[in-house]
A protein has these predicted regions:
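Aromatic- and glycine-rich peptidoglycan recognition patches
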Residues: 1-10, 62-79, 94-144
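N-terminal capping segments
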Residues: 1-61, 113
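Loop/turn positions that initiate beta-strands
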Residues: 86-87
């Protein structure tokens, strides 16, 4: 696994460990750093993970802080679920998207880092998260 992908997963796991201090809110600009407490939404959390890992902005905005789920769908490449790797993203719902999560472990039922309105970042299986999300799913990558 590449250093960038390892870094994205490490950042997502940092978020999971700090779940009580990471709150949900559609805040723009997206806070980019490890200062806690932190308020962000699902796409902001995914963007933060990429930023902390030193990856290019998955929103294609140069980390200006104004990316959102729709810009992830616009800028990242669709990948087949069987080709998903750690650090890739999954988006539920048609454009502009309803919810996104970071892939921690791929496989038949990928393990995700999901940050939603109900609670801060948590590790959850794709099948479990999908019970609460729209049926339309897009798997995304912008990583080598």
């Amino acid at each position: 696994m590449s250093e960038i992908r390892t870094g994205i997963v490490a950042a997502a796991r940092w978020g999971i460990r700090n779940e009580p201090r990471i709150h949900y809110g559609a805040v723009r600009p997206i806070p980019l750093g490890r200062e806690l407490p932190l308020t962000t939404d699902c796409s902001g959390f995914a963007t933060l993970c990429y930023y902390l890992a030193g990856a290019r902005d998955p929103n294609g905005r140069g980390y200006d802080g104004y990316g959102w789920t729709g810009s992830l769908l616009e800028r990242m490449e669709n990948v087949d679920r069987r080709a998903v790797l750690p650090g890739d993203l999954v988006v539920w719902g048609e454009y502009p998207g309803h919810h996104c999560a970071v892939v921690l472990e791929p496989g038949d039922d990928p393990l995700l880092a999901s940050h939603g309105q109900e609670r801060g970042p948590l590790a959850i299986r794709f099948s479990d998260e999908s019970r609460y999300q729209p049926a339309d799913v897009t798997w995304l990558s912008s990583l080598p």
